[in-house]
């Protein structure tokens, strides 16, 4: 078998046939109207779903700090984390993760997954109406979502530093059942109790 390779870091390509590669999955906790802060949960797991580390970081509701917070999580474990998998692009309301900047800061490929039917244009309209933050709008306008098939389900993805074929293979290998991989499902479950 010839392994699929993603060349993301000099002299450190990822052999996707190895179930031991580690992913950092990230999702946010729910929050109530009027709250200033929320949390993101990061889970480091092997491609086969074996969980090795759980962490959290505080983010500002509708702020601009989520890219930095995720980057800090990833850089603490840069020697082992090979792919960052995000549940969506927006955390803590409209705290938008700039996946291209996240890839630049960490050198780690980023896969941002969301349900079919999610729309950046709807987020842009809401941000224009409520926040008027052109930086967030610029990030959203640069996205190029693609459809991926996972276990017969269509899910959407935005990618940085990784090709769609490699992203699709990682998602399939990290999915135990259903349409979403463990790197999205597990942080979501943990974040719900915060």
From Swiss-Prot:
Q: Which InterPro entries match?
A: Endo_dU
Q: Which domain of life is it from?
A: Archaea
Enumerate the Pfam families for this protein: DUF99
> What does the similarity note say?
Belongs to the UPF0215 family.
What this protein is called in its record is UPF0215 protein TV0037
Q: Which organism is it from?
A: Thermoplasma volcanium (strain ATCC 51530 / DSM 4299 / JCM 9571 / NBRC 15438 / GSS1)
């Amino acid at each position: 078998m010839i392994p699929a390779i993603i060349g993301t870091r000099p002299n450190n390509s990822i052999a996707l046939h190895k179930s031991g590669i580690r992913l950092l999955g990230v999702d946010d906790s729910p929050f109530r109207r009027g709250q200033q802060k929320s949390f993101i949960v990061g889970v480091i797991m092997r491609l086969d779903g074996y969980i090795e580390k759980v962490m959290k970081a505080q983010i500002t509701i509708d702020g601009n700090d989520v890219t930095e917070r995720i980057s800090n999580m990833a850089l603490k474990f840069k020697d082992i984390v090979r792919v960052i998998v995000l549940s969506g692009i927006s955390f803590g309301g409209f705290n938008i993760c700039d996946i291209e900047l996240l890839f630049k800061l960490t050198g780690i490929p980023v896969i941002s997954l969301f349900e079919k039917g999610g729309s950046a244009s709807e987020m842009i309209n809401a941000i224009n109406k409520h926040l008027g933050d052109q930086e967030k709008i610029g990030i959203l306008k640069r996205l190029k979502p693609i459809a991926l098939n996972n276990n017969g389900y269509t899910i959407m993805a935005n990618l940085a530093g990784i090709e769609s074929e490699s992203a699709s293979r990682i998602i399939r290998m990290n999915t135990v059942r259903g349409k979403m991989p463990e790197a999205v499902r597990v942080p979501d479950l943990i974040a719900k109790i915060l």
